């Protein structure tokens, strides 16, 4: 029995890793923006993989507001809640409260049911680039426990037509690309202190492409462009995820059309 268990895990896991080593879109971070983007991109028929460094979904959703089990979403993001069948309750002035556990579960289920592949426990270490001028064409990754151990282990590769940084406050993928491929012309400014109503609007406005093949969504947008943080209101994260999906899909379709022409 033990042999069969081991062989089943090894053979099926390696098959998945092989299948998703070449994708249309690689998303780094299974938080609200990353999971939202994954669902809307996968629904369009794109091959999508999501890498999450932890062994759980949700990013900053789970702790709620200072560990209180509620988060807030504004009126503009309610259509996305409805898409994912997430229940919400009115608060005041166009704000609604949502249960963090329900939001995590339904965002993840929505992405998976749409066809996205989520792989947990993955630390993205670097990007792949090609060309002059350069374009980001994929990722290098290792398992998170290896990265945490401090051991030097060479990573493996994932090729992608588009890479989305949804890693949160540190904008880890964009930061490493800015540092190691200066020809991309990326500058990571660092996020500012809180100004929620301004940040919720600006994070959506600035969501999109930062360099050829590389996109940013969610709170990582604040880090890249020097925007204020917003705290435990997540409508901007959801809307940012949906917007980056729309931008990536439009760009990939335009590139495919140009190749055919």
From Swiss-Prot:
EC number: 2.4.2.59
Residues annotated for Fe cation binding in this entry: 154, 169
Reaction(s) this enzyme catalyzes, per UniProt: hydrogen sulfide + glycine + NAD(+) = ADP-5-ethyl-4-methylthiazole-2-carboxylate + nicotinamide + 3 H2O + H(+)
Keywords: Iron, Metal-binding, NAD, Thiamine biosynthesis, Transferase
Pathway it works in: Cofactor biosynthesis; thiamine diphosphate biosynthesis
Keyword match Transferase: yes
Biological process, per Gene Ontology: thiamine biosynthetic process; thiamine diphosphate biosynthetic process; thiazole biosynthetic process
Main EC class the enzyme belongs to: transferase
Record flagged with keyword Cytoplasm: no
GO molecular function, one term: pentosyltransferase activity
Residues binding NAD(+), per UniProt: 33, 52-53, 60, 124, 152-154, 219
Residues binding glycine: 229
Pfam family name, one: Thi4
Cofactor(s) the record lists: Fe(2+)
Subunit structure: Homooctamer; tetramer of dimers.
Chain's role: Involved in the biosynthesis of the thiazole moiety of thiamine. Catalyzes the conversion of NAD and glycine to adenosine diphosphate 5-(2-hydroxyethyl)-4-methylthiazole-2-carboxylate (ADT), an adenylated thiazole intermediate, using free sulfide as a source of sulfur.
Family: Belongs to the THI4 family.
Entry protein name: Thiamine thiazole synthase
Organism: Pyrobaculum aerophilum (strain ATCC 51768 / DSM 7523 / JCM 9630 / CIP 104966 / NBRC 100827 / IM2)
UniProt gene name: thi4
